[in-house]
């Protein structure tokens, strides 16, 4: 599979852009475990233009992440075009447009999946961004606004016609949010439309090698994007790649292995963000590495409250000492929430 001139190989796996999750240190970890493409957290076009510090911070990328995409969202054409130019200046490999976020404060303003109710505006915004930047432009969206308006087949063709380099489709409508099961049937129909010539990437509920294999084999997608299943589990990319290559399901990493992974992740966060912010922004990740351990609540509380770096590393070491022999086979982390 290729996105424009970016060669990704056969059956690539992509890390979904997720707010408050896919920060630089987490992207680094997912890349280390085999993600072929990673994406930033979504970035507000309005925030970039008004020089909002949080939005500008999200533009920071590292060469070790490549290929990496910067994802933007907004509801007005001109600010989105300007934001795309600013994002391109940060040096990503891909500019991605978010037409899929279902959260009310985003979609209710007409951005994210709210754009699916105004297809002409969606198409015009995309066309203008494609014309404004030199990097490949991709789109992530959903099946439609609700069950009565599943218009992804029309949208895919129209976005292809204005020059996008690839399309990622999440197998739910906006009305579903993240409820129920993702429906890949329409994703497969888009992919198998003879008029479609751009890569189609499927997204939704892929949390194992067998599920990824089914999506490739049954629906013919060019790539699979993994989102919530990466929470506390960046090694899922290694698991899936191993299964696709061998048909073998890898055992879950032991508690001791998870401790070493968490320590590496923490060190990377400290390196990138400094001590204070690096610790604060790791809290959402650290405890999730150890979901399912018995009597873990007091230790979890330490992981999400400590500010002393040596004490934090010592707490991680204590997890290996206390739970090192615990059977982790049934402790695959559950998604943190359904509102990303």
Where are these regions (language model features)?
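Flavin-dependent oxidoreductase catalytic cores
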Residues: 1-340
